């Protein structure tokens, strides 16, 4: 269900929330992955929606503010500031001054949000966003805004500095804050810093990112808009079953939906058949590290996987063929972990057009939908891409998140692409999925 998403939010209070217990003053080093371009200065935002119909008398802002103070004892870097070192890398100064907390009130009820299917500028009111030109040393590593609606429901908008945590780390933090809100004494998963495991002098992934930036000229897309499309679990399972009958191979939901979106975007952009297209997606590398990183590690540990194909082959071949290309790219990271991330890949594609590159990110298992502040799990989770700077490695990308509770097993695709191809992209997606769903 779509909402009008036109509403007004009034800020009631803006305060710094310090840890409930004194934290040691110190400078903490970030890892090589934390300091990568496209990561270190990036801000990622999450919206958690709660209907809260059964505890209307309880003030969520008060509960969450107190929980924030308690959880910062265990996550003290979020109560500090980022600082630039002489070599240009960032480090964290644990000052103990706290995270920024904002209490706000909307002039309507939650129905205005619908299922958060489409982006609206009004949604940015649910987050506290600094001007785009704000220096990295002046930002708050963590901002939490609680916006109450007239029906008693509320939205928690959280902005994380990507240099301190990745998506899994952010989910771990929010789950811990929920535990504090529900009266737990300490987080169930102990947070671990240990960024020294990835030493700054290691070439771990740094070369790959710099190399990628060098071969990609500035985009000519211009404006990028945010949209969404939900693929139901029934549709996904139907396609997976068809591919299994065709090949006797298991295909994951991510592989199937990524292949569909890659084909649909390529066709919608009408890229010449003689050119190549590249798909880039992220994979968690915690289990690949030797020894494996502890569960509580919340720093960046995501690797970039690349798959490339010729446009003519991509569009004329079968869906199974594209799924296999994605599978092969995933296996390459598992099998060649060290060599893949330390040395440049052979056969680099310096001539590929920037517009022919698309990024994918799977946010379904980060734990955001499990965050419980005392009102149960979030009824809906979404993202608003409002970063400080345009430092993304790719401008056109897709993020996979869980749909609202009424369709928990499907995939909601958040798309970021030129406005001129939004309709054609959705048309191509529907055409392909219908071919499998209506198959006799």
UniProtKB/Swiss-Prot annotation:
The active site is at residues 162, 372. This is 10-deacetylbaccatin III 10-O-acetyltransferase. Gene3D superfamilies: Chloramphenicol acetyltransferase-like domain. Its EC number is 2.3.1.167. It comes from the Eukaryota. The keyword DNA-binding does not apply. Pathway: Alkaloid biosynthesis; taxol biosynthesis; baccatin III from 10-deacetyl-2-debenzoylbaccatin III: step 2/2. Monomer. The keyword Transferase applies. GO terms for biological process: paclitaxel biosynthetic process. GO terms for molecular function: 10-deacetylbaccatin III 10-O-acetyltransferase activity. It holds the Pfam family Transferase. Belongs to the plant acyltransferase family. It catalyses: 10-deacetylbaccatin III + acetyl-CoA = baccatin III + CoA. Keywords: Acyltransferase, Taxol biosynthesis, Transferase. It comes from Taxus cuspidata (Japanese yew).
